[in-house]
Amino acid sequence: NEGDYIATHWTPTDSNLEGAIKSGKYADGYGYDLRVLPRRNLMLTSSFTGWSNYMMDFGKMLSDPEAMKHFGNTVVQWNLHTKQPKKVFDVPGAPLEIRCAWGENHNYCFTSTALTSKIWLIYEDKAGEWQAKEVADVGEPSKIPLPVDISIQSDDKMLWVNTFMDGKTRAFDISDPFKPKQVFEQKIGAQVNMVSSSWDGKRLYYTSSLLANWDKKGADNEQFLKAYDWDGKQLKEQFSIDFTKEKLGRAHQMVLNAYSLYSANEPAPSENLISKVTLK
């Protein structure tokens, strides 16, 4: 856990917007995930929740009215190069992971909200302004399935969304990013958190742990890494590692891939670049 301190860039709040524009009701100051689109000079951050909630037992937190007030409702747009916050979007319901499209002319990203079970699109409009729009439900929102991790296939045609409470993964056709359509659903375990789609789109990897204080109890506290083959219609399990049995602790995140796969998809010609770096 060693490292060198570089800098602090404060997230906008109602009391100090740090020069950003508040586009809606909220400027809560929470920070969670971060993604960038360098060619558009874009950095996005989500807001999820704060330290006090992470330290609470999950069931206790859900029944604590005060704790439930301490969830974020925003995504912030930043100038990537200067780290200046530019715009605060209302994305109510605790947005977690942000994933940006891979295509060089696909200027949009997705996030999901844990408490309201929505998929949101963060996109650049025709005027070059970034906007946020709710585009789909995940499962039955009233049952709070709790969307956690998301993963975009490298061809930008499929978005995988995991829900922690029901242990399911869902696939959404995002050929039209403004109209995601669920096309597949499968239970992975009693609980599931992270998902990673391989670069060729033929495999999915899943891990189970959200964080120690929030993972389920008893037999439902499954800790695993599972791998599946995906043929475009169904998932077929290839292997599963029981982290509890192997005394490996909690399975949170995984990165499994091969460098050779990154040439599997030919990139489209770039249009309207704001910035470009040539590596020699």
Model-derived segments and spans:
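A short beta-strand motif characteristic of beta-propeller blades
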Residues: 17-24, 84-89, 131-141, 181-186, ...
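Asp-box/WD-like beta-propeller blade repeats and closely related beta-sheet repeat scaffolds
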Residues: 1-38
